[in-house]
């Protein structure tokens, strides 16, 4: 079950990506519980995701939001797009994202779109390959965003100036 809910607390945008009912089979029958996948971000290069499980939907969402707020990471953006084309993978999911010109918008599907919206990317072209399981797509997207470097970071690693690096 895919759901999208947006809310704002303080300076963070929160998005609910997916709610899923899961069952534990026991001798007396099935015990149902719920899982929730959420992302939070400040729209300015900070993003985190959370995965919560509980017997009731609101409790699962609340747990996921708390985990997402504790799990915030920084991403180096270039204005409102990416620094350079990037690939990310997690488990069976692979994602490819590339910067886009002003006015393109977010061309991404499902879970990837939610992550890119809360991190503050406004122009991007992206594609998910392999498994489109929302949890793995979110993790692959965050993997790609974390591995993205600005020209300043790359120049510092190589011991060059930015002008020498860019030629």
UniProtKB/Swiss-Prot annotation:
For this chain, one GO molecular function annotation is:
rRNA binding
GO CC term (a single one) = small ribosomal subunit
Q: Identify this protein by name.
A: Small ribosomal subunit protein uS5
Which keywords are on file for this protein?
Answer: Ribonucleoprotein, Ribosomal protein, RNA-binding, rRNA-binding
Task: List, for all copies, the residue spans of the domain called S5 DRBM.
Answer: 12-75
| Organism field | Psychromonas ingrahamii (strain DSM 17664 / CCUG 51855 / 37)
Please give the Gene3D superfamilies that the UniProt record associates with this protein.
3.30.160.20, 3.30.230.10
| UniProt record similarity statement | Belongs to the universal ribosomal protein uS5 family.
Q: How does it assemble?
A: Part of the 30S ribosomal subunit. Contacts proteins S4 and S8.
Function, as annotated: With S4 and S12 plays an important role in translational accuracy. Located at the back of the 30S subunit body where it stabilizes the conformation of the head with respect to the body.
Tell me which Gene Ontology terms the entry assigns under biological process.
translation
User: InterPro entries this protein is in?
Assistant: Ribosomal_Su5_D2-typ_SF (IPR020568), Ribosomal_uS5 (IPR000851), Ribosomal_uS5_bac-type (IPR005712), Ribosomal_uS5_C (IPR005324), Ribosomal_uS5_N (IPR013810), Ribosomal_uS5_N_CS (IPR018192), Ribsml_uS5_D2-typ_fold_subgr (IPR014721)
Show the domain comment.
The N-terminal domain interacts with the head of the 30S subunit; the C-terminal domain interacts with the body and contacts protein S4. The interaction surface between S4 and S5 is involved in control of translational fidelity.
Q: Where is the signal peptide?
A: none
